[in-house]
Structure formats: structure tokens, C-alpha cells
A protein has these predicted regions:
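Hydrophobic anchor at the beta1->P-loop junction of P-loop NTPases
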Residues: 7
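Short glycine-rich anion-binding loops that position phosphate/pyrophosphate groups of nucleotides
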Residues: 80-82, 104-106, 161
Length: 190
């Protein structure tokens, strides 16, 4: 049995994409906390924020994280604010390692400016100038980045192509004793 690989980072860091690539490469199930919440509730993330506020959404997120922490051998893509709660971090560390995908704010703006902010309520949804998006990301990053670094087992530069980031995560995991199974070691070494 191996530990879950839990990806954290700012919105636009590539967590969902890298998680899918890792899942394919390692033969692991991928769980995206936002997708799980949408599946549980039948509602979009912006709808949940409007109906229940951020605190109500965070409680749903906590329940999803707690449930996912009962499994092993997952790749988990976490919402950007999931690790702000200590109880989520405690749950994740029971069966997983936390990998922080770090991306400069300017790269995040590039990734989000063409509609990528639409379903991200903490960015204020669509519209606004690139400068406004940059300022919102800087403000959000100012509070979140120190927390990501605090809780992560490793911080990785994720500003490059997603396939390279996934390979970097695998290289790190290979150097750990309890992240990959022996068969996963063999699989990625061939």
C-alpha cells in the first residue's frame, strides 16, 4: 500500500491536469475535491458559494477531504483553500503526502485570463482587467503561499509544462520510501 499524493497550490497551478497525468502514469485513481463536491451536491462551485457562503463550501470540502483520507493509492487534486483548515491537513497526512505546486503569479494570470476564472468565485468570476486579476491573485497568494509551504512535504516549480511537472513529482516520489508501491516503482522505471 502506498500513500496518497495530494496536490495543493493556487488556482491555475495545474493541480487537476498534473493529477490526471500522475494517475495515468501510476495507474492510480484521481480524485479532484471540487469535482467530488459537485458530484455530491449536483451544484457548481459558484452556486455553492452563493447558496452557502465560503464557510458552507469549506465544510463540504472538509467532508470530502475526510472521506478521501480513508483511501490509499490516490492522486488528489485539492481546491486552493483546502489546506487553510488544520483539520483538512491532519486528514490528508493520515494517508498521504502533500505536494505544493508553486507557480509565479504572472504565469497564473496567463493561465486564468482567458475564461479560467469563470468558475472560481474567490477571483470574482469572469471579467475585469488583467491588472485586477493579477492583484486578486497576489492578494490571495499572500495568505495562501506561506500555508502551502508550511504543510507541504515538498514544494515544486510548476510553471512549466504539466507533463514535466508530473515527471518531477514522480522523481521526488521515487526517492521516498513510502509514496509508491513496488509495482509503481517498476512501472515508472520502464
Amino acid at each position: 500500500m502506498s500513500r496518497n499524493i495530494c496536490l495543493v497550490g493556487m488556482m491555475g497551478a495545474g493541480k487537476s491536469t498534473v493529477a490526471e497525468l500522475l494517475g495515468d502514469r501510476l495507474g492510480r485513481r484521481v480524485a479532484d475535491t471540487d469535482d467530488e463536491i459537485r458530484g455530491w451536491t449536483g451544484r457548481s462551485i459558484p452556486e455553492l458559494f452563493m447558496e452557502h457562503g465560503e464557510e458552507g463550501f469549506r465544510e463540504l470540502e472538509r467532508q470530502v477531504v475526510e472521506e478521501l483520507a480513508t483511501f490509499h493509492d490516490l492522486v488528489v487534486s485539492l481546491g486552493g483553500g483546502a489546506v487553510l483548515r488544520d483539520d483538512n491537513v491532519s486528514s490528508l497526512l493520515l494517508t498521504g503526502v502533500i505536494v505544493h505546486l508553486d507557480v509565479p503569479v504572472e504565469v497564473l494570470v496567463e493561465r486564468l485570463r482567458d475564461g479560467g476564472a469563470d468558475d472560481r468565485p474567490l477571483l470574482g468570476g469572469p471579467g475585469g482587467t488583467e491588472e485586477e486579476l493579477l492583484e486578486r491573485l497576489r492578494s490571495t497568494g499572500k495568505t495562501r503561499d506561506p500555508r502551502y509551504r508550511e504543510v507541504a512535504d515538498v514544494t515544486m516549480d510548476a510553471s512549466g509544462p504539466a507533463d514535466q511537472v508530473a515527471e518531477d513529482v514522480i522523481a521526488w516520489a521515487l526517492a521516498q520510501t513510502d509514496v509508491l508501491t513496488p509495482s509503481e516503482h517498476e512501472q515508472v522505471m520502464t
